[in-house]
Amino acid sequence: SVKLGENRMDKCVLIVDDNDFNRELVKDILEDEDITVYEAEDGSSAIELLESEQADDIDVVLMDMRMPGMDGIETTKIIRTKNGKCMEVPIIAMTADGFETDIGMLQKAGMNGLISKPVDVNTLVEHITKLAGW
């Protein structure tokens, strides 16, 4: 399995997913890698968190594409219009329809990567490590 470098303290990922099971699954993977995890169950909660003081802690956002209300694309577009760290934080789309997803549309919205569900541990850790610059 892929292991993060020695300098992995204070690493933090925000998981945005309306499905409790999916959030817990990814959270367990990341916590096994000594990564702090923040959770949001919808787009508005994610935006609220990214506008709070806790935003400074967040290195990467894992964004579910299909959520009730605001989907992942819409949420990302709003995040990218905000000031401060929100504009820069890497956002990785998570989707069960990996092969049908338009990568160009994700990039245009401001997303930095795509991970298919079910989540592969090594792929997840590699993507996060690369985008966070750890």
Regions found by a protein language model. Give the residues of each.
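C-terminal compact regulatory domains
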Residues: 1-134
